A protein has these predicted regions:
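Conserved phosphate-binding/catalytic region of the ribokinase-like
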Residues: 1-11, 17, 186-190, 206, ...
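Conserved beta-alpha-beta core of the PfkB/ribokinase-like small-molecule kinase fold
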Residues: 161-263, 288-291
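Glycine-rich phosphate/adenosyl-contacting loop at the front of the ribokinase-like
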Residues: 1-79, 96-99, 103, 316-319, ...
Length: 401
C-alpha cells in the first residue's frame, strides 16, 4: 500500500525555557534566525535529555504537521536527517523527535542518521507578558539534506503527496540557487506525486523590511521552484517579502490588505504558472482565513478568492502564526480528493476551510496535547461542510467529538 503523504526535511526539536536569554542576544528580542551550526551553545547531551524529560521540548518542522494529518486516518511518512548519538543510535534531540512522531503513527523508516551533525535544534526564550523572546534555530543535520538519498524514499513509498519543509533552511537543500530543489520536486511529480513546498525564512522584523522594500536573498530560491510545485501557500507578510525580492517596487502601505493579497496572487500566477495541463493552487494566509487562486488543467483561472474562516469561534485571535497546521489541513483535504484536484473539479473553498479548521484547532491545543484537537477525517469534513458558525470553542469541539 502506498503512502498518502511524505513530508521531507527540517526535523527539529524546539526547546523553550525562560533562562534562554542567549537567544535574545543572538537574534534580538522577538527575533528569529537561522544560526550557524557551529555557534550552537555547548550544552551536553545529558542536559538536553534532562530538559526534554522535564517537558521543555516539542517536535517542530514535520512535528507540526505529520501527526495532524495522520490523526485523520491518512498514511503519513517522514523523511529526515537525524543526528547519531547514544540514545538508541540517535542524539537526544533526534530520539525525542523520532519517538514523538512514531507514537503518533508516523512511518519513520526513511530516516537518515547523519554521522557528523546533530539533529536540528531551536532554542526559544519563553517570556511572560507581551514581550516575545528570541528564537534561535541551529540546523545541524538539516543543512546536509541529500536529495539522492530521499529519492529512494519516494521510490519505496510511492507517496501520493510530497510536502517539502522548508525552502530557505537547508544549505544543501537550497544549493545551486534553489534549482536542485526545483529539479527534485519536478522529479517527484514525474513519479506520480502532487507536490507542495513551504518557504520559511527567519527574519527578525518583517514589517520593517516590507516597508523598506528590502530584498531577502533566500526568497530568490523560489524563482526556479514555484513553476514546479502544485500548491504553495504563504503568509501575508511573507508574500510581501517574496514580491519585494522577486519583483521590487510596490508601495504596500499605499494599498489595503485585501488589494495587496489579490495583487500578490495575480503576480504569482502570471509569473510562475506554466501551460502544462495541471492544476495549480496558490494562496495567502491571513489573520482570519486565507486567499486562494487556482488554475485548472484547461487553463481557466479562478480567483483570487477570499475565504474567511468559519472556525474563529469567538476565541481564536490570529491564524497567521498557524501556517504549518493550516497546510496540514489543506494537504489532508487535497490528498483525500486527489483525483478531483488533478482534474480541477475539487471544491477549493472547502480545501481552504479545512486548513482554517486545522489552524484553529491547533492554536487552541495545549502544549501537552498538541494534536488532540484533530479528529478522523469524516468528522472534520462534516464540520467543514456544515453551515454552522460556532459561537465558542467549546461548541466547535463538541461538534467534532
Amino acid at each position: 500500500m502506498s503512502t498518502d503523504v511524505l513530508i521531507l526535511n527540517t526535523a527539529v526539536t524546539d526547546l523553550r525555557r525562560p533562562d534562554f536569554e542567549f537567544a535574545d542576544e543572538l537574534v534580538g528580542k522577538g527575533g528569529l534566525a537561522k544560526c550557524r551550526t557551529e555557534d550552537m551553545p555547548d550544552y551536553s547531551q545529558q542536559q538536553l535529555a534532562e530538559w526534554i524529560e522535564q517537558g521543555f521540548a516539542t517536535a517542530g518542522g514535520p512535528g507540526n504537521t505529520a501527526p495532524l494529518i495522520a490523526r485523520t486516518g491518512l498514511k503519513v511518512a517522514v523523511g529526515v536527517n537525524l543526528g547519531r548519538g547514544d540514545y538508541d543510535g540517535l542524539d537526544a534531540q533526534g530520539r525525542f523527535f523520532h519517538d514523538v512522531l512514531t507514537a503518533n503513527g508516523i512511518d519513520m523508516s526513511q530516516t537518515y542518521i547523519h554521522p557528523d551533525l546533530h539533529t536540528g535544534t531551536t532554542f526559544i526564550h519563553s517570556t511572560i507578558g507581551q514581550d516575545r523572546g528570541g528564537i534561535a534555530y541551529f540546523p545541524g543535520a538539516n543543512d546536509d539534506y541529500d536529495f539522492e538519498i530521499f529519492k529512494g524514499a519516494v521510490e519505496r513509498l510511492r507517496p501520493r503527496m510530497v510536502y517539502y519543509m522548508y525552502s530557505g533552511l537547508s544549505d544543501r537543500g537550497d544549493a545551486n540557487g534553489g534549482r536542485d530543489l526545483a529539479e527534485f520536486i519536478k522529479w517527484c511529480r514525474g513519479n506520480g506525486a502532487v507536490t507542495i513546498v513551504d518557504s520559511h525564512t527567519l527574519t527578525g522584523n518583517p514589517h520593517a523590511l516590507i516597508e523598506q522594500g528590502v530584498a531577502v536573498k533566500e526568497y530568490r530560491l523560489l524563482e526556479p521552484l514555484l513553476p514546479e510545485v502544485d500548491l504553495f501557500f504563504t503568509s501575508c507578510d511573507e508574500a510581501r517579502l517574496i514580491e519585494n525580492t522577486l519583483a521590487p517596487g510596490r508601495k504596500w502601505i499605499e494599498f489595503g490588505e485585501h488589494e495587496n493579497n489579490v495583487h500578490f496572487l495575480d503576480f504569482l500566477t502570471e509569473r510562475f504558472w506554466r501551460k502544462d495541463g495541471r492544476t495549480k493552487l496558490f494562496g495567502v494566509t491571513v489573520s482570519d482565513g486565507a486567499y486562494e487562486q487556482h488554475v485548472n488543467p484547461d487553463e481557466t483561472v479562478d480567483g483570487p478568492n477570499r475565504i474567511e474562516s468559519r472556525f474563529m469561534a469567538g476565541e481564536v485571535v490570529d491564524l497567521v502564526g498557524a501556517g504549518d497546521s493550516f497546510r496540514a489541513g489543506l494537504i489532508t483535504y487535497v490528498t483525500s480528493h486527489l483525483d478531483e484536484f488533478k482534474a480541477g473539479s475539487i471544491d477549493f473553498t472547502e480545501a481552504v476551510q479545512m486548513g482554517n479548521l486545522f489552524a484553529s484547532m491547533f492554536i487552541k491545543a495545549p502544549l501537552e496535547d498538541r494534536y488532540g484537537n484533530i479528529h478522523a477525517y469524516d468528522k472534520m469534513l462534516k464540520v467543514v461542510r456544515s453551515d454552522v458558525t460556532y459561537q465558542s470553542f467549546d461548541e466547535l469541539q463538541d461538534a467534532l467529538s
